[in-house]
UniProtKB/Swiss-Prot annotation:
Keywords carried by this UniProt record: Cell membrane, Kinase, Membrane, Phosphotransferase system, Sugar transport, Transferase, Transmembrane, Transmembrane helix, Transport
GO BP annotations, alphabetical order: D-glucose transmembrane transport; phosphoenolpyruvate-dependent sugar phosphotransferase system
Chain ranges of the PTS EIIC type-1 domain: 3-427
InterPro entries found in the cross-reference section: Dup_hybrid_motif, Glu_permease_IIB, PTrfase_EIIB_Cys, PTS_EIIA_1_perm, PTS_EIIC, PTS_EIIC_1, PTS_Glucose_EIICBA, PTS_IIB_1
Native source organism of the sequence: Staphylococcus aureus (strain MRSA252)
Stated name of the protein: PTS system glucoside-specific EIICBA component
Chain segments annotated as transmembrane: 12-32, 81-101, 137-157, 182-202, 223-243, 284-304, 315-335, 340-360, 364-384, 395-415
NAD recorded as keyword: no
Residues in PTS EIIA type-1 domain copies: 560-664
Residue ranges occupied by any PTS EIIB type-1 domain in the UniProt entry: 438-519
Source lineage: Bacteria, Bacillati, Bacillota, Bacilli, Bacillales
Pfam families: PTS_EIIA_1, PTS_EIIB, PTS_EIIC
UniProt-annotated catalytic positions: 460, 612
Family matches, as Gene3D superfamilies: Glucose Permease (Domain IIA), Glucose permease domain IIB
Length: 688
């Protein structure tokens, strides 16, 4: 029950990222447009008074503001797209449903435009009744004030309607309305019902949200910012932080702008105050990110590099430099945070506490900087330095330097004190047990706690998936010693990364548990040894080309811990734009998984590559895939290997991102080209 709910929350959290991703563009337009009206800047650059420049700046400001004014609609459309696999029909259904829901609430409660205008008049007079209005004018519709929550509710319902009815069959005389055309129709009916229910259910919910907002923001805002920072960072590993911060950014708090309109939410209030040119009172739930993202985490990356083994410093230095620079410039911290989250959780605990104090310190100092993307240098320039007199953004620099020092010394001390296995400090060698191919499944079964400890057994092309009865009986170190490159633990679910042989291990373990095969007896084998030297031909260089038309992304951005953590090997992520996967080099097909979602290839020089089409696509049981080749077949670079129904994958798989992994890199060097747009003729990697 909990795990199912957890999975649904993760999906919702990811869906919310789509509308949030629009905000940086809107924020840039609003910030630059507003800055061009800044009196101090106009004094320095009088040419900004030119009528054409004034018109351009006004258009930019208005273009940015209209996005923030209509966030609920964007959340409705974005949530539907995210939860329905990106299908445009779901977005259309959400748009129609959102309009109908608001119109229904307005009619049921007899809300008129006069009610809205009377509020606007009261807001200008700052009357008590005008501070927390229950009504709003949404796209010209007088209705209840449901904010972004209303958009999310309707978007989720539209996605549910799409997933439920997109392939519905109707009688022949209604055939035109079958399939996806039926989705907006049924969503309209659902929207009417939702509007009626919310007409009576939302007012008490609204009162509760207002009370919670007042309590958090007015009773002890200093403590609230500290707790907010801790919880927000703590939820990063689970992907639930988007759900947590959304009410703070888009609903909690209120401000009446110069037009008499009520603006809700910390981020939206900050943008409204930016446009109005008044002192900032918002930003308590955004400003705290700047010190630890721009200064703290890059310093932590340096501490990790400093403590790496000498022979691994070059590799670790490159990784940490890239991750630290990304955090500093853009505020994207996940590549750096995930580099130590699983191998050294104590460091992440330190990081979480420091993040909480960062929010607290920024609030105590009165620093108020908005953001639309994250707390990196780019947002710092746009929303901090351009408004330094109102935001007090210059204080971020000395505070950030202090945080850099604290992060560095705490990470350095913890790594050495607790002998943490951060990148570059892994054991030189892992003891590998001598287990033959025949004995391996027996040994893995023993390491999992034996037959009685196995509740469910499964596998995909990369990992053995086992649900156990008692996790304490599992010998994780023993599983790694048997050749697993990593073991993930989620509750009582164990995932052992054995690579392409995972499915065979599962198959043999199932037969062992059913009694079909028994443990082989120990046999001593004597081989005749030759005194003749063995000549090994150098493999040389292997060029690896794109497996289709699409986008290349770093492996660290693949939404799967096993691939992103390079447990299977190094490589890249590929986002296909056309439904055809082609051979990346001349070679041989070594493996085609029974569910067709993954292909193993070997080049003529012996380099082994795994192409895993999508994430968790093993669960599709072959639906959406059409294999064009056979095992042991010779293929040439660019030859089609698999036809893929991308629309089906987008609707039924968590992601279509396709990891492309070198599984036998070992002591060879992998050079990844600086490529984003790819096609079958473009070089993306070279193995030397």
């Amino acid at each position: 029950m909990f795990k199912k709910l957890f999975g649904q929350l993760q999906r919702i959290g990811k869906a919310l990222m789509l509308p949030v991703a629009i905000l940086p563009a809107a924020g840039i337009l609003l910030a630059f447009g507003n800055a061009m009206h800044n009196e101090q800047l106009v004094e320095i650059a009088p040419w900004l008074k030119n009528d054409i420049i004034v018109m351009i700046s006004s258009v930019m400001e208005a273009a940015g503001q209209v996005v923030f004014d209509n966030l609920p609609l964007l959340f409705a459309v974005g949530t539907a797209l995210g939860l329905a696999g990106g299908d445009g029909v779901a977005a259309l259904a959400a748009l129609v449903g959102y309009l109908i829901m608001n119109a229904t609430m307005g009619k049921v409660l007899h809300i008129t435009i006069d009610d809205i205008f009377s509020y606007a008049k009261g807001a200008k007079e700052l009357s008590q009744a005008a501070k927390e209005p229950a009504h709003a004018l949404v796209l010209g519709i007088p209705t209840l004030q449901t904010g972004v929550f209303g958009g999310i509710i309707m978007g989720a319902l539209a996605a549910w309607c799409y997933n439920k009815f997109y392939n519905i069959t109707l009688p022949p005389f209604l055939g035109f309305f079958a399939g996806k055309r039926f989705v907006p129709i049924v969503t309209s009916v659902v929207a009417i019902a939702t509007g009626v229910v919310l007409s009576f259910a939302w007012p008490p919910i609204q009162d509760g949200l207002n009370s919670l907002s007042n309590f958090l923001l007015n009773k002890n805002l200093t403590l609230t910012t500290f707790i907010f920072g801790i919880i927000e960072r703590s939820l990063i590993p689970f992907g639930l932080h988007h759900i947590f911060y959304s009410p703070f950014w888009f609903e909690f708090g209120s401000y009446t702008n110069h037009a008499g309109e009520l603006v809700r939410g910390d981020q939206r209030i900050w943008m409204a105050q930016l446009k109005d040119g008044v002192p900032f009172t918002a930003g308590a739930f955004t400003t705290g990110k700047y010190p630890f993202m721009m200064f703290g985490l890059p310093a932590a990356a340096f501490a990790i590099y400093k403590n790496a083994r000498p022979e691994r410093k070059k590799i670790v230095g490159g990784l940490m430099l890239s991750a630290g620079l990304t955090a500093f410039l853009t505020g994207i911290t996940e590549p750096l945070e995930f580099s130590f989250l699983f191998v050294a959780p104590v460091l992440y605990g330190i990081h979480v506490l420091l993040a909480g104090t960062s929010f607290l310190v920024m609030h105590l100092l009165g620093v108020k900087i908005g953001m639309t993307f994250s707390g990196g240098f780019i947002d710092y320039i746009l929303y901090g330095l351009l408004n330094w007199d109102r935001s007090h953004a210059l204080l971020v620099i000395p505070v950030g330097i202090v945080y850099a020092i604290v992060y560095y010394f705490l990470f350095d001390f913890a790594i050495r004190k607790f002998k943490l296995k951060t990148p570059g400090r892994e054991d030189e060698e892992t003891e590998i047990r001598n287990s033959s191919v025949a004995k391996l499944p027996f040994d893995v079964l023993d390491a999992m706690g034996g037959k009685e400890n196995i509740k469910h057994l499964d596998a995909c092309i990369t990992r053995l998936r086992v649900e156990v009865v008692d996790k304490s009986k599992v010998d994780v170190a023993g599983i790694k010693a048997l050749g697993a490159s990593g073991v993930l633990e989620v509750g009582n679910n164990m995932q052992a990364i054995f690579g392409p042989k995972s499915d065979q291990i599962k198959h043999d373990m199932a037969k062992i548990m059913s009694g079909e095969i028994t443990k082989p007896s120990e046999t001593t084998v004597t081989e005749e040894m030759s005194d003749e030297p063995v000549h090994v031909e150098a493999l040389g260089t292997t060029d690896i080309y794109a497996p289709g038309v699409g986008q290349i992304i770093p492996l660290s951005e693949v939404p799967d811990q096993v691939f992103a953590g390079k447990m299977m090997g190094d490589g890249v992520g590929f986002i296909p734009e056309k439904g055809e996967i082609v051979a990346p080099f001349d070679g041989t097909v070594k493996t085609i998984f029974p569910t067709k979602h993954a292909i193993g290839l070997e080049s003529e020089s012996g380099v082994e590559v795994l192409i895993h089409i999508g994430i968790d696509t093993v669960k599709l049981n072959g639906e959406g895939f059409e294999s064009l080749i056979n095992v042991d077949e010779k293929v040439t670079q660019g030859q089609p290997l698999m036809k893929v129904n991308l629309a089906y994958l987008k609707a039924h798989a968590p992601s279509i991102v396709t990891p492309m992994i070198i599984t036998n890199l070992e002591n060879k060097e992998l050079v990844i080209e600086d490529v984003q747009d790819a096609d079958p003729g473009k070089l993306i990697m070279t193995v030397k």
